[in-house]
Amino acid sequence: MPLELDLQVASDAADLPSEAQFRAWCELALRQRAESELTIRLVDEAEGLELNSTYRHKDYATNVLSFPADVPEEFLDIPLLGDLVICAPVVAREAREQHKPLQAHWAHLVIHGCLHLLGYDHIDDAEAEEMETLERELLAELGHPDPYACDDEEPPSKEK
């Protein structure tokens, strides 16, 4: 499956995954599509806060925001999926607080965001169960643990 990935690093965070890792995670999540084009922008908290405030009216930086491409109906067959914005410091903080391996948490959030770009959501319980099941299956293929196994509290802040 050809994937055109534009990785933009606008963060000073350490321990960021490599472009090859981002590509592998996206290809796994998007394997049902023949072709895909997307941008992943890695940001610090200031930009994450600004975007979350502007688009979700939430006064905090969230881990991942998805922006599906708004493609006119006559061009629906083009491979453009949209953009993911991932706040690197939030990802690192959540991994620490939730006692999750950092790379596993990155993989989860990239897969989660890609699934949103494919139209999956978690607004109601049935949708959430479908999306979380798929996330678990994909992460298991990578050898990562179930990201929801230790959810004693609210799930990590997720985009809508």
UniProtKB/Swiss-Prot annotation:
Database matches in SUPFAM superfamilies: Metalloproteases ('zincins'), catalytic domain
Bound cofactor: record note: Binds 1 zinc ion.
Cellular localization per UniProt: Cytoplasm
InterPro entries noted in UniProt: MetalPrtase_cat_dom_sf_prd, YbeY, YbeY_CS
Needed cofactors: Zn(2+)
One of the record's GO cellular component terms: cytoplasm
UniProt-annotated binding residues for Zn(2+): 112, 116, 122
EC annotation from Swiss-Prot or TrEMBL: 3.1.-.-
One of the GO biological process terms: rRNA processing
GO molecular function: metalloendopeptidase activity; RNA endonuclease activity; zinc ion binding
Stored PROSITE patterns: UPF0054
Main subcellular location: cytoplasm
Keyword set, alphabetical order: Cytoplasm, Endonuclease, Hydrolase, Metal-binding, Nuclease, Ribosome biogenesis, rRNA processing, Zinc
Gene3D superfamilies: Metalloproteases ('zincins'), catalytic domain
Region named Disordered: 141-160
Described purpose of this protein according to its UniProt entry: Single strand-specific metallo-endoribonuclease involved in late-stage 70S ribosome quality control and in maturation of the 3' terminus of the 16S rRNA.
Family statement: Belongs to the endoribonuclease YbeY family.
Protein name: Endoribonuclease YbeY
Lineage, opening ranks: Bacteria, Pseudomonadati, Pseudomonadota, Gammaproteobacteria, Pseudomonadales
